Every structure is written in structure tokens, then in C-alpha cells.
């Protein structure tokens, strides 16, 4: 756990196997998955204030057919709490599609009611206002340059996330287990300003004590 928490970019199962001299890759992988499971605190506070929300694809190029259609790729919804012009806390979720049910459901689970939610004009966000949020819509008309201009914070997080997945895990994260890696990234990102390298370790230790670890079968059978 100390190795995982104190290495700035995280630790792959292969790296942990090498560091601890483990004979089995599966043992190292399972240890890390159990730690990732504990990185989401039960009852954690929701994002507040102004929150940018968008989605990004992990694992390939976006299909140009049918808008935000998924073709063998993983779609990740991103919510970024703004602190003035800076990025605050984030939330990430692997969603099955870009429907209103998936996207508004993500917002409801991640953002406090009454907050200002800033999205583009994708119809999956049409019900955000009805869900109790102040909904600000900026049309991007499918133009990546406009999207980057009007949603710089969420695009920064998406870029950093992809870089981290590629550097630490060589992009070898399957959709089935992607959420745990997203949880790890959010856990690290939201504590990036800590002056003490051991803060992640102590926070994770606290959360591990409060929950029961999953078995190998529970982890591998998870969807």
C-alpha cells in the first residue's frame, strides 16, 4: 500500500510484482484492485459551485457515426468542480452510453443539487435542469476546437487521465475493470496538493478499515 500511495504516477501490477518479488502476477493485480476498491469513500461529499461536465473516449478514436456512438471503446463521464479559474475536485465514471439516463444519473450522483452544471448541447444533458441544477449550455456544434475553448478544465482532466493510463498501465486497462482505475486517478488527483507524501497512505488506510475487502471472484465477476 505504501508503494502504491507514494509513487507519484501510481503502480502497475507488473511493477508491484517486481518490487515485492512476487511469483504471481495475479497476486499483485488482486492486491492493487482491492486497494482501488477502497479509494471511494462511502458518503463522500458531492461537487459544488460551478461544475463542468463532459465525456471522453478511452482506448481509441471517437466514431463519427451517430454522434457519440460507442464502437468497442470505453466512454468516461467527467465532472470538474471549478475553483475560480482553477480545477478543483473531480469525479469520473465509466458509463455504458451517452444517454440522458447515464449522464444525468452520473451528475446526480456526483454533483450537489443547486450547483451550476455547465455542459455542451448534447441531448443527453437535456434533463439536467429538471434534476434540480442550474444548467448552463454552451453549443459546440461537434467542433473539437470549440469544445476545448469552452470546456478547458474538463478537457485538461481528460488529457491527464489518458496520459496516466498510458504511462503507468501502458493503456492495458479493460472496460470491465476501468472504473477502479478511474477511482484511483480521482483519489490521487483530488489530493494532489497535499504537502505530505503520506497523506494518501493514511487516508486509504482509514478507508480500508471501514470496508470489507472483496474476494478474487467478486472482483473478477464485477461488470
Which stretches of residues belong to each language-model region?
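Residue-level recognition of single "structural anchor" positions
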Residues: 1-223
Amino acid at each position: 500500500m505504501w508503494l502504491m500511495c507514494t509513487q507519484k504516477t501510481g503502480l502497475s501490477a507488473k511493477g508491484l510484482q517486481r518490487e515485492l518479488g512476487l511469483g504471481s502476477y495475479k497476486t499483485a493485480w488482486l492486491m492493487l484492485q482491492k486497494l482501488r476498491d477502497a479509494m471511494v469513500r462511502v458518503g463522500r461529499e458531492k461537487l459544488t459551485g460551478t461544475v463542468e461536465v463532459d465525456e471522453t473516449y478511452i482506448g481509441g478514436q471517437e466514431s463519427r457515426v451517430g454522434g457519440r456512438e460507442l464502437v468497442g471503446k470505453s466512454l468516461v463521464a467527467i465532472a470538474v468542480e471549478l475553483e475560480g479559474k482553477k480545477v478543483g475536485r473531480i469525479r469520473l465514471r465509466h458509463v455504458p452510453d451517452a444517454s440522458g439516463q447515464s449522464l444525468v444519473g452520473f451528475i446526480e450522483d456526483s454533483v450537489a443539487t443547486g450547483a451550476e452544471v455547465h455542459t455542451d448541447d448534447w441531448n443527453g444533458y437535456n434533463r439536467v435542469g429538471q434534476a434540480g441544477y442550474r444548467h448552463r449550455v454552451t453549443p459546440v456544434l461537434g467542433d473539437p476546437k470549440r469544445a476545448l475553448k469552452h470546456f478547458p478544465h474538463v478537457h485538461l482532466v481528460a488529457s491527464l487521465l489518458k496520459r496516466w493510463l498510458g504511462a503507468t498501465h501502458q493503456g492495458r486497462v479493460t472496460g470491465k475493470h476501468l472504473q477502479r482505475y478511474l477511482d484511483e486517478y480521482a483519489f490521487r488527483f483530488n489530493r494532489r496538493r497535499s504537502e505530505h507524501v503520506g497523506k494518501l497512505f493514511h487516508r486509504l488506510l482509514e478507508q480500508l478499515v471501514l470496508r470489507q475487502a472483496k474476494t478474487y471472484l467478486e472482483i473478477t465477476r464485477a461488470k
